[in-house]
Amino acid sequence: KQYFILTDMKKILTILVSILIMVPFNEAISCTSAIFTGKVTKDGRPLLLKHRDTGELNNRIEYFQGPKYGFLALVDSPSEGGVAWSGSNNAGFSIINTASYNLKDDDVPSSMMDREGELMYKALGVCKNLKDFEYFLDTLSRPMGVEGNFGVIDAEGGAAYYEVNNHKWNKLDVNDPEVAPNGYFIVTNFSYTGREDEGMGYIRNCNTTYNVENYVLKEGGKVDPQWIFENISRSFYHSLLEVDLRKDQELASGWFIDQDFVPRRSSSASMVFQGVKPGEDVSKTVMWTILGYPPLGVAVPMVVANGENIPSFMVKSESSENAQMCDMVLELKKNVFPVKRGNGNKYFRFNYLYNKEGTGYSQQLKEVE
């Protein structure tokens, strides 16, 4: 690896602004994800993360009854139904996705693509385990209309990523020591079996890998949902610049570029699915959810078995399609990203989130969480 040590702040900002102008739109609909097996978690239960980035910043939770299983899912707000952007069912099957940009190998038109949400909605209603999901993929009509990475855990100890395009899929078994020798696997917006050096999210992948390796491998730490939220979804470490805004008070004294951190202006939710050990009651499966911009949100645990009794502030209200929690977070977020004209939306007030006085929004909300 080659790292560039940039000491001149003006030089950093000039370079970053140039990059930002050239960033393609689909970087805004990218996600960061990870699977942690019981080998590296505090209670031995698997954890599945999806940190969502999207053009639709309003999200809410809904409960659905599928052909076989009921399930909780993250959906856009408003939503016309039939689409889930992650979820968990009452059989202990949980699924997430990240978009991939190096798997498509055909000329299927864009009008037939972007059906990942439909695929997950259908899978949550009929799948109990990884075997069911693989059969489900095999029996879908082609082209499937997807180009993505699907992370799945089940109640039988299964944990895997599936790299899927219109015609085929490839499995990365996170329990396989050759695939995940350290008990975890991190996925952003490229597929490991896809075209080399294409796709997106390489810096976010390095950011996350750095934080996880330091904690799990160097410190011998064990992971739980709170650690994931604090050190992935709310981390402002940048692996290319080798800066961590939460630790460097000089860099973090005011404004900064919103580029290639895991949490970005386009971040709309963060979910950690806490599975069960083989043989445990599947009703112990928990869906930890932050709606809105994760550095400003509060993680709320929801039990799938109690899915029809979701906290009222996480679902649409009588007066709005939006969840009250998400609305409150997005209102606060306006102060962090206040500039709308020109390239102003590429900058954010980091010191409104974290500061040395301890009065940042994120610092105050941590006590609530």
Segments from the language model and where they lie:
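An amphipathic, aromatic/His-enriched active-site/gating alpha helix that lines ligand/cofactor pockets
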Residues: 151
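Short, basic/low-complexity N-terminal boundary segments at the transition from targeting/disordered tails
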Residues: 13, 22, 60-68, 123-135
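Hydrophobic, Leu/Ile/Phe/Ala-enriched alpha-helical segments that form helix-helix packing faces
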Residues: 1, 20, 137-141, 275, ...
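Intrinsically disordered, low-complexity linker/loop segments enriched in Gly/Pro
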Residues: 116-148
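C-terminal, well-structured catalytic/ligand-binding subdomain of enzymes
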Residues: 32-81, 86-87, 94-122, 154-369
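Short, charge-rich binding segments
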Residues: 86-88, 142-143
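Bacterial Sec-dependent N-terminal signal peptides
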Residues: 1-30
